[in-house]
């Protein structure tokens, strides 16, 4: 009988670096590699524990003097869109979305570059090459899909693949208890469509249809304008010191989860 067990994951700590969200703060991260047949199970456990995935690495903040990054997940089954969200859905009624294996394309990369060049010129991803993008999409050992959003054109619905212009893309992990939005981007020239909001609403719909209770949005950082949109999707839970807790304005003064 084979009594060997799979090795436990090894965790590492990064060196301090400037925080991309809060000026004057330094960030550190704890991370581990997710490879092999246990990767999907490990991804589930770590995401539920406040980690995020980037390629085959799972990481979470481990900052020495700050606990501003809080993991957020939407309660999909209880979610009801606000009036403004219903307007976003109506305004994007001409969009066709489809789910594909995690495979990059030149069309995706061109959209990705336009998005970065407009929205994140000074960010850590601003110099990503086509090879970097391909690795971001393909380097996964978990259940990852690419969701493409295209404008509907005449003839869509007759063939399997939509043919309209690609205007948004989401890289998404399917887990045992929900969908995790790893990264998403959209055409910055179509800002009036609120495509970021639309993609989150679409993921909530997909989670409901599959009987999955959560949509994981990553980290919310109080005081960061970039992250403010995440608390608009209610009800939601935040990972605090005592575990996942239903969010309310009072949570702003509650201590988040620590190592």
Swiss-Prot record:
<comment type="function">
    <text>Functions in the N-end rule pathway of protein degradation where it conjugates Leu from its aminoacyl-tRNA to the N-termini of proteins containing an N-terminal aspartate or glutamate.</text>
</comment>
<dbReference type="InterPro" id="IPR017138">
    <property type="entry name" value="Asp_Glu_LeuTrfase"/>
</dbReference>
<dbReference type="GO" id="GO:0004057">
    <property type="term" value="F:arginyl-tRNA--protein transferase activity"/>
</dbReference>
<dbReference type="GO" id="GO:0008914">
    <property type="term" value="F:leucyl-tRNA--protein transferase activity"/>
</dbReference>
<dbReference type="InterPro" id="IPR030700">
    <property type="entry name" value="N-end_Aminoacyl_Trfase"/>
</dbReference>
<dbReference type="InterPro" id="IPR007472">
    <property type="entry name" value="N-end_Aminoacyl_Trfase_C"/>
</dbReference>
<dbReference type="InterPro" id="IPR007471">
    <property type="entry name" value="N-end_Aminoacyl_Trfase_N"/>
</dbReference>
<keyword id="KW-0808">Transferase</keyword>
<dbReference type="InterPro" id="IPR016181">
    <property type="entry name" value="Acyl_CoA_acyltransferase"/>
</dbReference>
<protein>
    <recommendedName>
        <fullName>Aspartate/glutamate leucyltransferase</fullName>
        <ecNumber>2.3.2.29</ecNumber>
    </recommendedName>
</protein>
<dbReference type="Pfam" id="PF04377">
    <property type="entry name" value="ATE_C"/>
</dbReference>
<keyword id="KW-0963">Cytoplasm</keyword>
<dbReference type="Pfam" id="PF04376">
    <property type="entry name" value="ATE_N"/>
</dbReference>
<keyword id="KW-0012">Acyltransferase</keyword>
<comment type="similarity">
    <text>Belongs to the R-transferase family. Bpt subfamily.</text>
</comment>
<dbReference type="GO" id="GO:0071596">
    <property type="term" value="P:ubiquitin-dependent protein catabolic process via the N-end rule pathway"/>
</dbReference>
<dbReference type="GO" id="GO:0005737">
    <property type="term" value="C:cytoplasm"/>
</dbReference>
């Amino acid at each position: 009988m084979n009594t060997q067990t799979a090795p436990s994951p090894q965790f590492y700590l990064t060196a301090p670096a400037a925080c991309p969200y809060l000026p004057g703060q330094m960030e550190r991260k704890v991370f581990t590699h997710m490879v092999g047949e246990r990767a999907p199970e490990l991804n589930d456990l770590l995401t539920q524990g406040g980690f995020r995935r980037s390629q085959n690495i799972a990481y979470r903040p481990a900052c020495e003097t700050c606990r501003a990054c809080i993991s957020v997940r939407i309660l999909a089954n209880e979610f009801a869109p606000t009036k403004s969200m219903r307007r976003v859905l109506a305004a994007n009624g001409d969009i066709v979305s489809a789910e594909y294996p995690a495979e990059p394309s030149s069309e995706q990369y061109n959209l990705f570059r336009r998005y970065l060049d407009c929205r994140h010129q000074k960010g850590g991803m601003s110099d990503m090459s086509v090879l970097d993008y391909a690795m971001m999409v393909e380097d996964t050992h978990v259940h990852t899909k690419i969701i493409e959003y295209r404008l509907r054109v005449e003839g869509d619905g007759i063939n399997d693949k939509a043919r309209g212009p690609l205007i948004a893309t989401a890289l998404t992990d399917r887990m045992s208890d929900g969908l995790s939005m790893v990264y998403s981007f959209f055409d910055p020239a179509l800002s009036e469509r609120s495509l970021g909001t639309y993609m989150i609403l679409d993921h909530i719909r997909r989670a409901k249809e599959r009987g999955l209770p959560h949509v994981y949005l990553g980290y919310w950082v109080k005081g960061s304008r970039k992250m403010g949109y995440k608390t608009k999707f209610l009800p939601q839970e935040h990972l605090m010191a005592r575990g996942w807790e239903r969010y309310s304005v009072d949570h702003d003064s509650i201590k988040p989860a620590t190592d």
